[in-house]
Amino acid sequence: MFPWTKSFVENHNKFEPKTIFFGSEGANVVAVVDLLIKKLISQIDEKDYHNLALDQIASPNFYLLKADEGKSFITMDQLRAPKDFLTLNTSKNRVLYIQSAEQIRIDGYNALLKVSEEANENIYIIIATSNLNAVPATILSRFHKVKIAKPSPEEVMIYAKDKGINSEQGVMEFISYNPWILEDHNEKILDALHGFGKQISDKKISSKDRLELDTFVDYLIFKRKKKVNGTEARDNLQKILELNDIKKSLNSPNNLSIDIAKLRITSCL
């Protein structure tokens, strides 16, 4: 666990009945809120769930709502399903956790609004999102909002160096603004990142992994943004627009093939 994540989780002890936790992608919102949810439901049930995955928690007081595996969105049926859970009279608090607000369509929010208004007073409805703008005003006005701030680049740099991570200055700077790369399960991405400079100089992309390509695009955008005020500002802005479109296509349900993505990325080198 990152030190800044540990500090936030340990110091957040008061939960409002309806809360949206939000922050930028670099704030790692879902991972942080997952930990908060484990903390809350452990307190309610007087059991220790900290070492369990959320979908392994078998508690009558907890309901996890997220898109099914392989799906991009939470269905209307899924959103309506917690109605009995939310309206059942019980002496204990209950928790409905919507793991990613980005997985709810606009029409789905109407169903969520109705469900939330029918919920008992002892129900916690917790939503996590990396894009507060994706949440309709009708929901925002009814929920307490808590921002999860990104760690400062200096904090991330100190942590990375303490972990023995060292690379060229540009890569280290990129990592300092994208601390998620330092998570244990992203070792493959971290290893690939060290080779991004050579791929750029050779104008040849070796990666065949979609997440690596997505990170490579982020790295190119990061480098281009540092040059938008220079003599090649116009070209850099055009390349940033193209790279953002590639990133969007990589992450869309009907995403680009790896080979086409690599061709488009190469044109931006």
Q: Which stretches of residues belong to each language-model region?
A:
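A short hydrophobic beta-strand->loop->alpha-helix junction that borders the nucleotide-binding pocket
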Residues: 22-24, 64-69
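Conserved alpha-helical scaffold flanking the Walker A/P-loop in AAA+ ATPase domains
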Residues: 7-12, 73-95, 103, 110-114
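Conserved beta-strand scaffold positions in the cores of enzyme catalytic domains, especially
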Residues: 62-64, 145
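Charged, glycine-rich active-site and insertion segments that engage polyanionic ligands
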Residues: 1-56, 121-123, 130-269
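Flexible beta-alpha connector loops of hexameric P-loop NTPases
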Residues: 69-75, 101, 145
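A short alpha->loop->secondary-structure connector
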Residues: 81, 115-121, 145
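Conserved Walker B catalytic segment
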Residues: 100-119, 131
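Loop/turn-to-beta-strand initiation segments
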Residues: 91-95, 120-126
